[in-house]
C-alpha cells in the first residue's frame, strides 16, 4: 500500500489500547497523542505562532472553506503556502471544507459530485467537489489534507447514514486520485452512532491507501456517553499502522477517554473559543471568570499550572476585571492558559502510556473532574462541538 514520501507514523509504546507514537512530516516530528489548536482563518485566535508552540503544539489545523473564500488559495500559494504565509514552522493539517460548505453556506445542495452552495460572505456560487478540495488544499500546502466527506446530522435515519458512508467512500477514491504526491491524505470514517456501520466503513477506507484515518461525525448532538462508548469500540478497530484522528473533539474528559481507545490526534475549538467567552479550564473543571466570587480572589487560575498566565502572577480578580472591562489582554491570557492545559494533558498522557500506568492516569484525571465541576465543563456551549460547527462561524 502506497504512502506519501516524507510522511510516516511509528508506534513507540502501548498500554492497553492507549499508545504513543511519532508522526513524521516535512515540517518536523509530532509526538502523539497530540492536540491540534484550531487556526480557522490562518491563525490561532489572539496568539502568535511562537506562543502557540510554547504550549507544546507541533501541529495546528487550518480551515479550507474559509481560506478558500478569503484570501484565496492562489494568493496563499503565491506567498509561499500556509507555513510561510502564517509563519507557523511546524506541521499543519487542513480540513476539506465540506462541513462548512454544507452548514454555513447559503442555499447549499448535496449531489453526487459534491456540494453546490453560495458563499456566506458575498453570495457567490461555488462548487466543492473532491477534486476542488484537493486542489485548494494542495495550493494551501499543509502537510496533511483531509478527504471531502459527508457528515450526516445527529439523529439522521440509518438509510441517510449508510448513504453518507457510501458517498464518502466514493469521494475518498476521487480525492486519492487527485491529491498532490507530496501531501498526505487522511480518510474520514462515518457511520453515526452505529458501531457496525463505523466498523464496516473503517474497513472500506482502510483498504484504500490513505496515510491516516479519521473519525468524523461525532459531537453533532449525540449524548456524550454514547460518543465515548462508540469511540471506545471503533478506535482499536482502526488500522494500527496509521495515525487515528478524532475530529472536532473535545473536552479534556473526552480526550482522556479517546486516548484510552487508541486515538492519536485531536482538534477542537474548546480551549480557544471558551477562553474568549471568559472560561478558564482546569483539571477540576472550568472557571467562569465573570462570576462575582472572583472579584477579590488573589489566587491564580490554577496553582499547579505552569502557563505564563498562572506563573506570571495574574490573579483571578485581575482577570475578572479585564473581562468585565472588555480588555483584549484577558482573551490572550485565558487562551494561553487553556492551550497550556491541553498541552500538559498530552504530555502527561504520553508519559503515562510509556510507563505503563495510563489506566491510573485516566482515573486520576476523571476523578479530579468528577470532584470539581466536570458537568459544567461538559455543558459549556461549544465544548464538544466540532471544529466546523463552532470556530468556523466566527
Swiss-Prot record:
InterPro entries with a match to the protein in the record: ArchSynthase1/Queuine_TRR, TGT, TGT-like_sf, tRNA_ribo_trans-like
Region (Disordered): 375-394
Cofactor(s) the protein needs: Zn(2+)
Record SUPFAM superfamilies: tRNA-guanine transglycosylase (SSF51713)
GO molecular function: metal ion binding; tRNA-guanosine(34) queuine transglycosylase activity
Binding sites annotated in the UniProt record for substrate: 95-99, 149, 190, 217
Top-level EC class as recorded in UniProt: transferase
Entry annotated with the keyword Transferase: yes
Gene3D superfamilies: Queuine tRNA-ribosyltransferase-like
CC terms in the record's Gene Ontology section: cytosol
E.C. no: 2.4.2.29
Catalytic residues, chain numbering: 95 (proton acceptor), 267 (nucleophile)
Entry note: cofactor: Binds 1 zinc ion per subunit.
Single GO BP term: tRNA wobble guanine modification
UniProt keywords, alphabetically: Glycosyltransferase, Metal-binding, Queuosine biosynthesis, Transferase, tRNA processing, Zinc
Region of interest called RNA binding, as start-end residue ranges on this chain: 248-254, 272-276
Reaction catalyzed: 7-aminomethyl-7-carbaguanine + guanosine(34) in tRNA = 7-aminomethyl-7-carbaguanosine(34) in tRNA + guanine
Residues at which Zn(2+) binds: 305, 307, 310, 337
Pathway entry: tRNA modification; tRNA-queuosine biosynthesis
Function description: Catalyzes the base-exchange of a guanine (G) residue with the queuine precursor 7-aminomethyl-7-deazaguanine (PreQ1) at position 34 (anticodon wobble position) in tRNAs with GU(N) anticodons (tRNA-Asp, -Asn, -His and -Tyr). Catalysis occurs through a double-displacement mechanism. The nucleophile active site attacks the C1' of nucleotide 34 to detach the guanine base from the RNA, forming a covalent enzyme-RNA intermediate. The proton acceptor active site deprotonates the incoming PreQ1, allowing a nucleophilic attack on the C1' of the ribose to form the product.
Subunit organization: Homodimer. Within each dimer, one monomer is responsible for RNA recognition and catalysis, while the other monomer binds to the replacement base PreQ1.
Record-stated family: Belongs to the queuine tRNA-ribosyltransferase family.
Protein name (database record): Queuine tRNA-ribosyltransferase
UniProt lineage: Bacteria, Pseudomonadati, Myxococcota, Polyangia, Polyangiales
Gene assigned in the entry: tgt
